[in-house]
């Protein structure tokens, strides 16, 4: 296994190095283009060590070697393909080899006039100069993309052909480049040779380390040309640019919904598969996304890492903090397209839009009543269960809704935090203030569909509507007479009151007609009772 990794790494090194078989063509093209002022005589690709490396590369098994590499015809006259350094005779064109034998480093006689970088071979120097000139002489015939080196074109063309000549012996996965295979192989060995000097985190690929280092340095070299937002890596920039272009290249095969990011598609597909791969170790609750599991764990730990700089409020989620911050800024970025009403949260906008569409997607399974909001359904369910989980600590009164408890507690505190700006009248509830303010504005938003009469309060409309339906839901327990309004029932019940002002109870089979509970005669002439006084003997 180690032998395979070394071979793969050899192939990766050769593939990433300028001494690659594909670059032989580049160097042969460059052999007559060395700078004249330096009297450089480029006679082809450097041999020596590079020939030995190419021989080793050609011996890599076909499962991890490039067919082009094994079939390439490489001339053997390596001695005639050395580049002579300035002022060198052909017999003296290996100064670096003698220095290496003595333990010294190779000479680098070709120096870039733009950046000062030096090279041992003029061909490498010429390839480097294309960085400054921007020259890209190798163009892809399929898409027209151009490259500065033919080896880069060869690698690129595999994106069109789908060729993946480097296969993993362990799992069979294939790759278009040897360096990708070498990196992949580390998933089997667990090797992470590239370690961050700042935090000690290790990575399988040097590119991953380079990207990670930007977390410490704050470097964001990839900037969006449209909005100037900067990113640490190029892939993040490409994904971001889809926001501007509207491109959604990842489509769900089940429902055809499209996404900008492949990760978003993967998360979405779990809706269809119902896969929940992320499980909480404490309560075994499972989640489709790891971010949701991370947030859920804070329920157990009580961790609230996000702090509001204005008021010090703590939050377990960054999104909750962002929404809270709008209380201080007054920002309402989500506007309704029909009435222009704005909201601080997109969920509030979604709920509001249902007032226009009439959509009520949450049905009660007990009575069939439907609701536009899930929280309203949960509150309604308490009607069926009779549960009153919210109890007042001062008087013991219990409530089915926490909002009802909060309003009730103001009875004990006397708090009236909602004050009318017109007349200064204060209220304990915001809804009471809203109703009161309509007395100043004259607003009557509730209209009867039968007769068009408008009301400032929804409850007034409900009471009024009984006039049209003829419904009489309020019945007198004393005489059975029914009324449309509770106020009418209260007025009627006063006709049954005894001399002390107490209401007469409903007659029972065992009670004496015409007598109140205290034995006094009913003075108001209830049906079936004696209005004239006690019964005669």
Swiss-Prot record:
<dbReference type="InterPro" id="IPR036236">
    <property type="entry name" value="Znf_C2H2_sf"/>
</dbReference>
<feature type="zinc finger region" description="C2H2-type 1">
    <location>
        <begin position="110"/>
        <end position="132"/>
    </location>
</feature>
<dbReference type="GO" id="GO:0000978">
    <property type="term" value="F:RNA polymerase II cis-regulatory region sequence-specific DNA binding"/>
</dbReference>
<feature type="zinc finger region" description="C2H2-type 10">
    <location>
        <begin position="362"/>
        <end position="384"/>
    </location>
</feature>
<feature type="zinc finger region" description="C2H2-type 6">
    <location>
        <begin position="250"/>
        <end position="272"/>
    </location>
</feature>
<feature type="compositionally biased region" description="Polar residues">
    <location>
        <begin position="509"/>
        <end position="524"/>
    </location>
</feature>
<keyword id="KW-0863">Zinc-finger</keyword>
<feature type="zinc finger region" description="C2H2-type 5">
    <location>
        <begin position="222"/>
        <end position="244"/>
    </location>
</feature>
<feature type="zinc finger region" description="C2H2-type 14">
    <location>
        <begin position="474"/>
        <end position="496"/>
    </location>
</feature>
<keyword id="KW-0238">DNA-binding</keyword>
<keyword id="KW-0479">Metal-binding</keyword>
<feature type="region of interest" description="Disordered">
    <location>
        <begin position="497"/>
        <end position="537"/>
    </location>
</feature>
<feature type="region of interest" description="Disordered">
    <location>
        <begin position="12"/>
        <end position="109"/>
    </location>
</feature>
<dbReference type="Pfam" id="PF00096">
    <property type="entry name" value="zf-C2H2"/>
</dbReference>
<feature type="zinc finger region" description="C2H2-type 12">
    <location>
        <begin position="418"/>
        <end position="440"/>
    </location>
</feature>
<dbReference type="GO" id="GO:0003700">
    <property type="term" value="F:DNA-binding transcription factor activity"/>
</dbReference>
<comment type="function">
    <text>May be involved in transcriptional regulation.</text>
</comment>
<feature type="zinc finger region" description="C2H2-type 2">
    <location>
        <begin position="138"/>
        <end position="160"/>
    </location>
</feature>
<keyword id="KW-0805">Transcription regulation</keyword>
<feature type="zinc finger region" description="C2H2-type 4">
    <location>
        <begin position="194"/>
        <end position="216"/>
    </location>
</feature>
<protein>
    <recommendedName>
        <fullName>Zinc finger protein 835</fullName>
    </recommendedName>
</protein>
<dbReference type="GO" id="GO:0005634">
    <property type="term" value="C:nucleus"/>
</dbReference>
<keyword id="KW-0539">Nucleus</keyword>
<comment type="similarity">
    <text>Belongs to the krueppel C2H2-type zinc-finger protein family.</text>
</comment>
<feature type="compositionally biased region" description="Polar residues">
    <location>
        <begin position="63"/>
        <end position="77"/>
    </location>
</feature>
<feature type="zinc finger region" description="C2H2-type 8">
    <location>
        <begin position="306"/>
        <end position="328"/>
    </location>
</feature>
<feature type="zinc finger region" description="C2H2-type 3">
    <location>
        <begin position="166"/>
        <end position="188"/>
    </location>
</feature>
<dbReference type="GO" id="GO:0006357">
    <property type="term" value="P:regulation of transcription by RNA polymerase II"/>
</dbReference>
<dbReference type="InterPro" id="IPR013087">
    <property type="entry name" value="Znf_C2H2_type"/>
</dbReference>
<feature type="zinc finger region" description="C2H2-type 11">
    <location>
        <begin position="390"/>
        <end position="412"/>
    </location>
</feature>
<keyword id="KW-0804">Transcription</keyword>
<dbReference type="GO" id="GO:0008270">
    <property type="term" value="F:zinc ion binding"/>
</dbReference>
<keyword id="KW-0677">Repeat</keyword>
<keyword id="KW-0862">Zinc</keyword>
<feature type="zinc finger region" description="C2H2-type 7">
    <location>
        <begin position="278"/>
        <end position="300"/>
    </location>
</feature>
<feature type="zinc finger region" description="C2H2-type 13">
    <location>
        <begin position="446"/>
        <end position="468"/>
    </location>
</feature>
<feature type="zinc finger region" description="C2H2-type 9">
    <location>
        <begin position="334"/>
        <end position="356"/>
    </location>
</feature>
<feature type="compositionally biased region" description="Basic and acidic residues">
    <location>
        <begin position="89"/>
        <end position="104"/>
    </location>
</feature>
């Amino acid at each position: 296994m180690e032998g395979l990794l070394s071979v793969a790494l050899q192939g990766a090194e050769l593939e990433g190095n300028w001494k690659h078989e594909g670059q032989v063509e580049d160097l042969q093209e460059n052999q007559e283009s060395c700078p004249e002022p330096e009297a450089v005589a480029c006679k082809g690709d450097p041999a020596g060590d590079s020939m030995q490396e190419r021989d080793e590369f050609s011996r890599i098994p076909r499962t991890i070697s490039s067919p082009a590499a094994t079939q390439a015809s490489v001339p053997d006259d390596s001695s005639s393909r050395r580049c002579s350094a300035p002022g060198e005779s052909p017999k003296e064109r290996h100064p670096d080899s003698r220095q290496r034998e003595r333990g010294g480093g190779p000479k680098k006689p070709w120096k870039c006039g733009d950046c000062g970088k030096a090279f041992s071979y003029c061909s490498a120097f010429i390839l480097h100069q294309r960085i400054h000139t921007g020259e890209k002489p190798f163009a892809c015939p399929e898409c027209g993309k151009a490259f500065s080196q033919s080896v880069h074109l060869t690698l690129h063309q595999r994106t069109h052909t789908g060729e993946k000549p480097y296969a993993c012996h362990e799992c069979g996965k294939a790759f278009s480049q040897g360096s990708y295979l070498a990196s992949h192989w580390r998933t089997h060995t667990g090797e992470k040779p590239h370690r961050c000097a700042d935090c000690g985190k290790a990575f399988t690929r040097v590119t991953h380390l380079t990207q990670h280092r930007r977390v410490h340095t704050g470097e964001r070299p990839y900037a969006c040309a449209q909005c100037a937002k900067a990113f640490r890596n190029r892939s993040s920039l490409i994904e971001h640019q889809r926001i501007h272009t509207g491109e959604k290249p990842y489509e769900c095969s089940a429902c055809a919904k499209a996404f900008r990011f492949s990760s978003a598609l993967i998360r979405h597909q779990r809706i269809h598969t119902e896969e929940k791969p992320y499980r909480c170790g404490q309560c075994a609750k499972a989640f489709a996304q790891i971010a949701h599991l991370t947030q859920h764990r804070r329920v157990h730990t009580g961790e609230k890492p996000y702090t509001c700089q204005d008021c010090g409020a703590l939050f377990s989620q960054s999104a909750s903090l962002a929404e809270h911050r709008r209380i201080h800024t007054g920002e309402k970025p989500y506007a309704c397209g029909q009435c222009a009403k704005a909201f601080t949260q997109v969920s509030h906008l979604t709920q509001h839009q249902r007032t226009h569409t009439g959509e009520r997607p949450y049905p009660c399974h007990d009575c069939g009543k439907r609701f536009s909001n899930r929280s309203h359904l949960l509150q309604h369910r308490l009607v069926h269960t009779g549960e009153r989980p919210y109890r007042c600590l001062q008087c013991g009164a219990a409530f089915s809704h926490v909002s009802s408890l909060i309003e009730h507690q103001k009875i004990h505190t006397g708090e009236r935090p909602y004050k009318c700006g017109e007349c200064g009248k204060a209220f304990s509830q915001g809804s009471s203030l809203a109703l009161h303010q309509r007395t100043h504005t004259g607003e009557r938003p509730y209209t009867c569909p039968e007769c068009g009469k408008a009301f400032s309060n929804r409850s007034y409309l409900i009471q009024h509507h009984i006039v049209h339906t003829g419904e009489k839901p309020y019945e007198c327990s004393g005489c059975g007479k029914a009324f449309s309004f509770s106020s009418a029932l209260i007025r009627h019940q006063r006709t049954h009151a005894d001399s002390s002002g107490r209401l007469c109870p409903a007659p029972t089979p065992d009670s004496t007609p015409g007598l109140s509970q205290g034995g006094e005669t009913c003075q108001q002439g209830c049906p079936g009772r004696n209005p004239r006084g006690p019964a005669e003997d």
